[in-house]
């Protein structure tokens, strides 16, 4: 029946999404009591690693054949950061797989289950011998495409930043408070 296939599709899609729980520990927050971007970034990378490992594409497995993952781009957009001691979770899924790159997305979810931010990333698998990109579709007979998920991620894809001039237009000494208000 159609209803049964819809339930199967939802379950199948849900199995493609990894959910990982965290707590904003006191040593992971800034003086405002909010999680720092560096710690959030570390959690995002760990979630990508856990998710890939659980599906047979983790660093340890790739290293056996002298391959590794390299992060090419990362864009993060947040409405708010978790506070000290707050529980939060991160979901991750693969949006697309191309021959040389894969798109991995993330949702940051607060303790009430509300999505408070998203991230998009672009990854390449490279040969540790040649340092050149490897063909993702040749890995495990292309089975990585079985994990592609159509979960929405409502932020723009990260694009390459083009530098218009080689000459700096200004100099700025950045201080912590300057960066908070960007």
Residue ranges of each PLM-predicted region?
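Preference for bulky hydrophobic residues occupying beta-strand positions
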Residues: 22, 76, 92, 106, ...
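Active-site helix/loop of acyl-thioester processing domains in fatty-acid/polyketide metabolism
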Residues: 38-64, 177-179
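Short, structured beta-strand/loop micro-motifs enriched in basic residues and often containing a Trp
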Residues: 70-73
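Hydrophobic beta-sheet segments that form the core/acyl-binding groove
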Residues: 75-112
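Short, small-residue-biased leader/transition segments that mark boundaries at the very start
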Residues: 3-8, 182
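Catalytic strand-loop segment that frames the active site of acyl-thioester-processing enzymes
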Residues: 9-43, 126-131, 136-180
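Contiguous mid-protein beta-loop-alpha structural module that forms a pocket-lining wall or clamp
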Residues: 97-142
């Amino acid at each position: 029946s159609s209803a049964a296939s819809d339930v199967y599709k939802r379950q199948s899609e849900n199995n493609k999404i990894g959910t990982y729980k965290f707590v904003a520990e006191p040593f992971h927050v800034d003086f405002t009591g909010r999680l720092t971007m560096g710690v959030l970034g570390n959690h995002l990378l760990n979630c990508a690693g856990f998710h890939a490992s659980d599906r047979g594409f983790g660093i340890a497995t790739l290293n056996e054949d002298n391959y590794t993952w390299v992060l090419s781009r990362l864009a993060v957009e947040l409405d708010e950061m978790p506070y000290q001691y707050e529980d939060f979770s991160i979901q991750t899924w693969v949006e697309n797989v191309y021959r040389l790159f894969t798109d991995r997305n993330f949702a940051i979810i607060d303790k009430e289950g509300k999505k408070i931010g998203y991230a998009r990333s672009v990854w390449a698998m490279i040969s540790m011998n040649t340092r050149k990109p490897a063909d993702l579709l040749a890995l495990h007979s292309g089975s990585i495409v079985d994990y592609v998920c159509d979960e929405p991620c409502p932020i723009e894809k990260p694009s390459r930043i083009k530098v218009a001039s080689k000459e700096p237009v200004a100099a700025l000494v950045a201080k912590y408070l300057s960066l908070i208000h960007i």
